[in-house]
C-alpha cells in the first residue's frame, strides 16, 4: 500500500519516509475522530500549528532524549494539536498529542485523512546553512526540524523491537539492519 514505509509509491520510484495510519472512527460529517498518541516519552522540539506552512500540515516532532543517539518521532496531518502542548513540553508515552486529520500545504481529501508517522534521526544541527545554499523560494519555517533534516527508519520493525527491548540503544538496532548501499567518496 502507498501508506507503508519505503519505495511504495509511483511504481517504486517515490520513497515514503513514514507510515500512514488511517482512522478507526469518523464523526457524523466524515472527519477522522481518532486521537493521536505519543509512541514513546519525549520532549516536544517542534510544533507547527499552521497547515499551509508545511506539506506535513499541522505537525509536531518529539525528541526521545532517553535514547542514545536520540531519536525523533513526527506526527503529521493533524486536524488539531492538543491544548497546552508547546515546544519544550515533556510528553509521556501514550499521551494525547492531537486529532488525526487531513491538513497540509496541499489538498488532502477528507476521506483520505490519516496520521503520517515517522521515527528517525536528525541529520544536522545547522540545517539552515544548508537550506540557504539551495534555490528554494520558500522560507524554512521549521528550523532543524524540517522534514529535509530528518531521516526516517521503518517505524514498524523498529517499534516492535523497541517494545520487546531487544536492543539497548538505537545505534545497536541500526547496526543490525542490512546494508542498503556502500559508497566510496573520493576527493
Functional labels for PLM-detected ranges:
Residues 105-109:
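Extended amphipathic alpha-helical segments with heptad-repeat/coiled-coil character used for oligomerization
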Residues 63-65, 99, 120-122:
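Short glycine-rich beta-strand segments
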Residues 13-19, 92-93, 113-119:
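Serine endopeptidase catalytic core focused on the charge-relay Asp
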Residues 42-44, 85-100:
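A structural signal for short beta-strand/turn segments enriched in small hydrophobics and glycine
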